[in-house]
A protein has these predicted regions:
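Conserved catalytic or regulatory cores that recognize and/or transform ribose-phosphate-containing ligands
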Residues: 2-150
Length: 150
């Protein structure tokens, strides 16, 4: 599917599990690569790379928190892959929603997710299921097209 977004690129905070769920790395890469190819800025694109754990280990926890909070504040939207439970991703989603940011939480159809995500009635939260990486890329592109006036 071609990119649906026709304006200037958006600033997108991409969130995914770092310490667990790395079997979904090809999905993370498909999502990030599609958003970058469509002209969007993703300060957290490194999360989709195999070296992310080593990269994040050399940064102090307080630095990660301060950096990521600023990136979320500066983002137009937050896009998360939530198939693997993650304290950090849950916090990032809640923080972004608290700021009134649109959030997309994608997960594999065969993986249950926290009811704090699936049961959240916030109008700024979209929860979508997928089976294949190509499907999640289309979901992301549709979500971004719906929020391109931000």
């Amino acid at each position: 599917m071609a990119a649906l977004y026709f304006g200037d690129g958006m600033n997108i905070y991409f969130a995914c599990s770092i310490t667990g769920g790395r079997e979904f790395e090809p999905v993370f890469q498909a999502m990030v690569n599609a958003m970058l190819a469509d002209g969007h800025e993703i300060p957290t694109a490194h999360l989709a790379t195999p070296a992310v754990r080593e990269m994040e280990l050399i940064v102090a926890a307080a630095e990660v928190y301060a950096r990521d909070v600023e990136w979320i504040r500066g983002a137009d939207v937050l896009v998360a892959e939530v198939s693997t439970p993650s304290h950090g991703v849950g916090y990032e989603i809640g923080f972004a929603l608290g700021l009134g940011k649109p959030v997309l939480a994608c997960h594999r159809r065969d993986r249950g997710i926290s009811k704090m995500i699936s049961g959240n009635p916030d109008d700024n939260l979209t929860v979508s299921q997928y089976e294949m990486p190509e499907e999640v890329v289309e979901i992301v592109r549709i979500f971004l097209a719906q929020h391109n006036a931000i």
